[in-house]
Amino acid sequence: MAKKITGYIRLQIKAGEANPSPPVGPALGQHGVNIREFCESFNTATKNIEKGLPTPVIITVYADRTFSFITKTPPASVLLKKFVLKGKSGSARPNTEKVGKATRQQLEEIAKMKTPDLTAADLEAAIRTIAGTARSMGIDVEGVE
């Protein structure tokens, strides 16, 4: 018989940097989860992701206070800032003030990283999804309609 689920916790934690301080500690403590055990297993699971990239995680908490978790890929906006804007932030007025240019190749690279978490049917649809995010951040998109 499957374990009884008592809750889900959604957090965004920097890869390889989970520690018991807020927001991790209080969120897990409310559900009675062993915080140190989660931090160690999360840091181990995210060791192949670049350290410091915000990584969404969905934690499933069971009645016996055990847990399991699923890590997702970093948000598209974070990847766009990293690869296209080189750390700068997006535009406050994206329709009038452009802050950078994204090539189709850059968008394709990000789309390939995000494919497991996107609902896109194919790579082309994933590229268009990432291009939409880029446009909403004030990034000019080249080579994508």
From Swiss-Prot:
Pfam assignment, any one: Ribosomal_L11
Entry GO terms, CC: cytosolic large ribosomal subunit
SUPFAM superfamilies for the chain: Ribosomal L11/L12e N-terminal domain, Ribosomal protein L11, C-terminal domain
Claim: rRNA-binding is one of the keywords in the record: yes
One GO BP annotation of this record: translation
InterPro entries, per database record: Ribosomal_uL11, Ribosomal_uL11_bac-typ, Ribosomal_uL11_C, Ribosomal_uL11_C_sf, Ribosomal_uL11_CS, Ribosomal_uL11_N, Ribosomal_uL11_N_sf
Subunit structure as annotated in this protein's UniProt entry: Part of the ribosomal stalk of the 50S ribosomal subunit. Interacts with L10 and the large rRNA to form the base of the stalk. L10 forms an elongated spine to which L12 dimers bind in a sequential fashion forming a multimeric L10(L12)X complex.
Alphabetical list of PANTHER family matching this protein: 60S RIBOSOMAL PROTEIN L12 (PTHR11661), LARGE RIBOSOMAL SUBUNIT PROTEIN UL11M (PTHR11661:SF1)
Protein name: Large ribosomal subunit protein uL11
Species of provenance: Coxiella burnetii (strain RSA 493 / Nine Mile phase I)
Lineage of origin: Bacteria, Pseudomonadati, Pseudomonadota, Gammaproteobacteria, Legionellales
Gene name of this polypeptide: rplK
